[in-house]
Every structure is written in C-alpha cells, then in structure tokens.
C-alpha cells in the first residue's frame, strides 16, 4: 500500500468502536478527506477518484489452514458533490478480522500518524505504540522485517533511522534502538521506547477537527496487511522482563 492508502484505511479503522457489531458507511467532508490525503487547496476530484479506485483494487490474501481467502479492503466509495461528503465502506468480509478481534486492539491518536510521510514510519509507530508501556522490547530481525514489510537488507539505514527521526519530530513517542547479535550476525532489534508530551514535538499541521482527536483501533491484523504486498504476520514478539522473556503470539497462522 502507498502511504496515502494506509491513511485512508487508518481513518476508516478510527471510526470503528469497540462495541460495534457491524460495519457502517463512514463519511467525512470531501474537503477534509482531500486534506487527509495530504493535499491543500480546493479538492480535485480526479486525483481522489484515482486514489480510491486503486485502493479498491488492492487485494488481501488471508490463509487459514487449508483455505486461502482473497478480498478487497474497500468495497464502496461515493462522492456526493451536493452534500460535499465522501462515503466509504469496508468490504463486509473483513468483519471477522476487524470487529471480532477487538480484544487485541490498541488505541492511538490518529493525528499522531497523519503527518508521517513514510509507510515504514507508520508501521514502526504502530509497533512502538503497542509496546510503549513495556519500554524495552526485543523483536527478532526476521519478524520485524515481516511486520514492516521490509525486504531490503539495509533495514537500519532505510527504515529504522529515518523512522526514528520522523517519529520523534512528529508524534508522541521517541525511541532508541540497538542491534542484538549472535556472534557477528544481527538476530534482533531492541527498542527503548519513551512517551513524549506533544509539546516536545515539532508543531503538527492543522488536521480537520473531524479526524484529529479520534483514536485508531490498531490490531496485529491491520499491521500485517497495511503494506504493498500481504505477508505473513509475525509469529511472536519477545518482551524482556529481567532475565526471562515471554513469547506473545498474535495474528493468524500462515
């Protein structure tokens, strides 16, 4: 997924409430939707149509045992120039994954990711937010690659370092990280996470009032698929507690 497509999905997820039993038709003013996508000025319908048309074509592949399911993120988009609103809805087949996994959801403020320009930064932020109260989390390298959708061997240079700079400047978190080695081989990345008052961060651009204060309901399922190609979910994340470590299993088996 592109960064813009990720932000559309995050906005829709932010509209889900933990007590919802069904998807709704989600809407917002077209002007706000245009700004949400990172544009300024008067909305250009051709640009928005191209973005949502491409998003509807994005296919998820979900493997559950012997079954392979294919579905779209979005099943319907409507631009109503008379009311000045855009309407979007999830594919109803996503209900078991986004509604019935409520207990795995972690909330964060939508405005904390809307200014991020890198898809990697968004995914790293979500990972950190999930573990922010642990403060110190170690993630095996192969699992981290799957979680962020990074196949490039230059993970530190192209993913971690840029994400660290952008997240620190624009969100409520900062983090340090270091490589964990076995011999000469890097086998894991250890993150040291710190929550920051938003006043410490650079000034965040104005975000429409309908989207700035709402929470995103983040789940491992969402992080698993918000990237260009669907990939397997990380099978476990180890969180360090003194000398021992607890393995936490999330997501669907591949």
Regions from the PLM with identified roles:
Residues 1-233, 245-251:
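Charged, alpha-helix-forming regions
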């Amino acid at each position: 997924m592109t960064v813009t497509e990720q932000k559309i999905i995050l906005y829709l997820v932010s509209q889900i409430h933990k007590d919802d039993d069904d998807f709704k038709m989600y809407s917002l003013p077209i002007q706000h939707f245009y700004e949400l996508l990172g544009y300024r000025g008067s909305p250009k319908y051709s640009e928005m149509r191209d973005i949502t048309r491409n998003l509807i074509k994005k296919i998820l592949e979900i493997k559950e045992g012997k079954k392979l399911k294919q579905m779209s993120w979005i099943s319907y988009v409507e631009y109503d120039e008379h009311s000045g609103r855009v309407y979007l809805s999830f594919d109803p087949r996503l209900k078991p994954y986004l509604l019935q996994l409520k207990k795995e959801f972690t909330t964060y403020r939508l405005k904390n990711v809307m200014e991020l320009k890198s898809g990697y930064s968004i995914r790293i932020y979500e990972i950190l937010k999930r573990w922010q109260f642990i403060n110190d989390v170690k993630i095996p390298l192969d699992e981290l690659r799957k979680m962020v959708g990074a196949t490039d061997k230059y993970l530190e240079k192209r993913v971690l370092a840029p994400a660290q700079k952008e997240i620190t400047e624009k969100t409520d978190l900062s983090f340090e990280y270091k490589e964990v080695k076995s011999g000469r081989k890097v086998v894991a990345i250890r993150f040291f996470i710190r929550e920051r008052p938003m006043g410490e961060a650079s000034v965040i651009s104005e975000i429409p009032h309908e989207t700035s204060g709402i929470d995103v309901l983040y789940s491992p399922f969402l992080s698993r698929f918000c990237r260009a190609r669907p990939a397997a979910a990380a099978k476990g994340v180890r969180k360090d507690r003194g000398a021992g470590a607890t393995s936490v299993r999330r997501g669907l088996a591949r």
